Amino acid sequence: PSTGMPTKSEQTDLLQALYGRNGESPMPVIAATSPTNCFDAAYMAAKIALEHMTPVVLLTDAFIANGSAAWKLPNLDEYPAINPPYVTPEMEGTWTPFQRNEKTGSRYWAVPGTEGFMHRIGGLEKSNETGVISTEPENHQKMTLLRQAKVDKIADCIPELEVQGDADAELLVVGWGGTYGHLYSAVEHMRKNGQKVALAHFQYINPLPKNTADVLKKYKKIIVAEQNLGQFAGYLRMKVPGLNINQFNQVKGQ
């Protein structure tokens, strides 16, 4: 983000990534955790974008950008396939521009120029199914809910939240994005000194992993450490009410 201190690192644009659009416009948000994780994060962002027909925000930070690590070129055959919801010839004559896939809630992709699938696109609100411009109140309400549901369903396609550290810990350290290396080192240092502590680091921000609430509610105390004034902590409080969340916030550009 723009820190006012060029080349310095912060995590101060999380809420902008989540909500910085006109109206209720939910969008998936992913945060890379390290230089070596950037490729995997970008691949998954592309997979989500193409399979669910949605823009995706992929967050990095200056610390990741200026960092380096050994990275072995991956075998792409080991990555999950990307399967966009293309229209099929059998759909010609019955397809409508806003017809949705029942599993994902996404529209089918009629690539421009595909014979028999001509349609209009644009930034104005559309009527469900037909894609015709509409300002009807009930339709706008329905379309807003459909867009939110589409993003929510992405939780079915992302990995569950993993916890590292002591299985019997009462304290959970929570982070997201490029602070992973520092938080992991801090947690390991505490464990070597005899403290029972665990780490949960988030890469998928919106939607959150499906098991997020189950994981967080196991711990008596949670410390959310981030380079802002508590944006992710507030987001977690909203998504999982009732947690004992404590904040550790620094905005020092490092």
Task: Say what each PLM segment does.
Residues 1-24, 238:
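Flexible glycine/proline-rich, aromatic-decorated loop/lid segments
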Residues 3, 15, 24, 42-44, ...:
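Residue-level detector of functional hotspots within protein domains
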Residues 25-49:
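Active-site/ligand-binding-proximal alpha/beta "capping" segment
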Residues 46-254:
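Flexible, low-complexity linker and terminal segments
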Residues 1-5, 24-31, 244-252:
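Short beta-alpha connecting loops at secondary-structure transitions
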Residues 8-11, 32-39, 141, 177, ...:
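Conserved structured core elements
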Residues 2, 37-38, 65-68:
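Short, well-ordered, mixed-charge alpha-helical segments that flank or form enzyme active sites
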Residues 12-15, 40-43, 181, 210:
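Short, contiguous clusters of charged residues that form electrostatic/catalytic patches at enzyme active sites
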